[in-house]
């Protein structure tokens, strides 16, 4: 690769940013990470679900097993409904058996701790560096931070989250080249319909480690993940009074979280456990808006954004962090391919980076569309947003067998991995059986939902006098998912 190595400036010590640092290190590409906070592992009470495609990337980087000390693998999924009906499925265990990697829930700070502590050179992560501006200069890009220091590199990657400063700079740089390049419609395309209170509690009896619970209700839902040592990770998704446009959503305080929680304090979670039992034993909690969007403009010049800065979805499907890690892996793949294909040590021109960035963003948008749509459906289904989704949640989901696992398997098997590192060997068939070119990959989400609506109405109209309809619904649901 020559004496002068490519240098990447990563803005944001996030999951995406630190994963990218590892990927670049393995690819032999220089980097520096600029993080505005004074510490990497700030305690927020947030937790992250690692699905097999995200776990595979972490495994390639040698970190997945380091997370096991913090986690209890998921093996069962319960659903409870406001009418008292409950349902249990084995989707987490099915996915583990199919892909050879357990589904694990880990505190966000512990994942960041593992990512940070396992870096070969932690001095390359610069803390307390808030970005002020980005500028192009003589085939390089410079980043100025609030303490006056200036960093120079060949490209900048914004991994600085949903409130991204780098995204603002991408828009500014694009408009400086040609006014109106980024339309106001795109700048206002991120919406907020739900807020989330999240936290960690301890000593809650009645919940079993490794058995997740989705508690559905009208206008809100709970996701509960009992973990190791009596700890419980939980989320309360709450529908707002209207659909807001970013950044115009309400700002929340701890008092707001207490006020909202009090409204649902008697809601049933599972096995006699009420939300009160979890809330009263909270160790830490927070509240945040659930932004939703996939932006279309990911780059300008030598600057590219990824992770939550470009795609943000509700936590109900657990895909957010996994998709961010995929972003990091794919970008590292493309940069490595570029360098391997060069006959000289010349660094990438602006035209080279435009081509690479455009391919990267198109490939990621294409991959993310179905994942994003599913996350939008699931958060609204869990909160019973309309009659169709309430029918689907109550009468279709409990009778679908492995349909949810099959849908998840398709997105998992299509996941990105680091193509310049060895793939872990798993004696599990799911990676091949649910690959995009396999027979099991075919099937239409729209068709599934249409069948769900038709037979949900039949079941709802007759309530308990149509058990045959429910069986037919389950059979058709399994059929159309294949």
From Swiss-Prot:
Pathway linked to the protein: Secondary metabolite biosynthesis; terpenoid biosynthesis
GO CC, any one term: membrane
UniProt membrane topology term: Single-pass membrane protein
Gene Ontology molecular function terms on file: FAD binding; monooxygenase activity
Main location (coarse class): membrane
Annotated Pfam families: FAD_binding_3 (PF01494)
Enzyme class: oxidoreductase
Residue ranges crossing the lipid bilayer per the database entry: 440-460
Biotech and industrial use: Shearone derivatives produced by this cluster are interesting candidates for Alzheimer's disease (AD) therapy since they moderately inhibit aggregation of amyloid beta 42 (Abeta42).
Residue positions the entry lists as glycosylated: 243
Co-factor(s): FAD
Family indicated by similarity: Belongs to the paxM FAD-dependent monooxygenase family.
PANTHER family the record matches: FAD-BINDING DOMAIN-CONTAINING PROTEIN-RELATED (PTHR47356:SF2), FAD-DEPENDENT MONOOXYGENASE ASQG-RELATED (PTHR47356)
Name by which UniProt lists this protein: FAD-dependent monooxygenase esdpE
């Amino acid at each position: 690769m020559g004496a002068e190595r490519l240098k990447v400036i990563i803005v944001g010590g996030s999951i995406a940013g630190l994963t990218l640092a590892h990927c670049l290190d393995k690819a032999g590409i220089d980097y520096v990470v600029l993080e505005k906070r004074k510490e990497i592992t700030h305690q927020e009470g947030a937790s992250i679900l690692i699905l097999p495609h995200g776990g595979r990337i972490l495994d390639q980087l040698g970190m997945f097993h380091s997370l096991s000390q913090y986690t209890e693998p998921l093996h069962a999924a319960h659903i409870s409904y406001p009418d008292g009906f409950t349902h249990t499925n084995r989707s987490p265990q099915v996915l583990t058996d199919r892909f050879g990697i357990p589904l694990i829930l880990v505190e966000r700070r512990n994942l960041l701790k593992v990512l940070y502590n396992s870096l070969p050179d932690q001095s390359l992560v610069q803390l307390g560096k808030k970005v002020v501006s980005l500028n192009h200069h003589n085939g390089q890009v410079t980043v100025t931070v609030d303490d006056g220091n200036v960093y120079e590199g060949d490209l900048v990657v914004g991994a600085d989250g949903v409130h991204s400063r780098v995204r603002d700079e991408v828009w500014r740089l694009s408009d400086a080249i040609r006014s109106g390049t980024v339309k106001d419609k795109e700048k206002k395309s991120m919406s907020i319909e739900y807020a989330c209170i999240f936290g960690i509690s301890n000593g809650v009896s009645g919940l079993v480690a490794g058995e997740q619970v989705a508690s559905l209700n009208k206008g809100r839902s709970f996701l509960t993940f009992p973990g190791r040592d009596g700890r419980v990770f939980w989320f309360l998704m709450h529908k707002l009074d209207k659909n807001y446009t970013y950044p115009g959503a309400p700002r929340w305080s701890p008092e707001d979280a207490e006020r909202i929680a009090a409204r649902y304090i008697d809601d049933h979670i599972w096995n006699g456990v009420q939300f009160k039992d979890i809330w009263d034993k909270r160790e830490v909690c927070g509240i945040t808006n659930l932004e939703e969007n996939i932006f279309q403009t990911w780059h300008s010049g030598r600057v590219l954004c990824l992770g939550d800065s470009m795609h943000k979805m509700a936590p109900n499907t657990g895909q957010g962090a996994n998709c961010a890690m995929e972003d990091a892996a794919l970008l590292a793949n493309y940069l490595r391919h570029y360098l391997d294909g060069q006959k000289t040590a010349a660094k990438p021109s602006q035209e080279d980076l435009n081509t690479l960035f455009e391919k990267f963003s198109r490939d990621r948008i294409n991959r993310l569309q179905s994942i994003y749509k599913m996350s939008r459906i699931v958060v609204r289904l869990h909160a019973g947003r309309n009659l169709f989704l309430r029918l689907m949640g109550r009468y279709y989901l409990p009778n679908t067998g492995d349909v949810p696992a099959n849908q998840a398997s398709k997105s998992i098997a299509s996941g990105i991995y680091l193509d310049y590192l060895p793939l872990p060997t798993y004696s599990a068939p799911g990676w091949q059986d649910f690959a995009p070119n396999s027979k099991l990959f075919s099937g239409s989400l729209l068709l599934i939902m249409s069948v769900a609506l038709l037979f949900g109405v039949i079941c709802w109209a007759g309530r308990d006098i149509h058990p045959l309809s429910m069986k037919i619904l389950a059979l058709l649901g399994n059929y159309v998912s294949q």
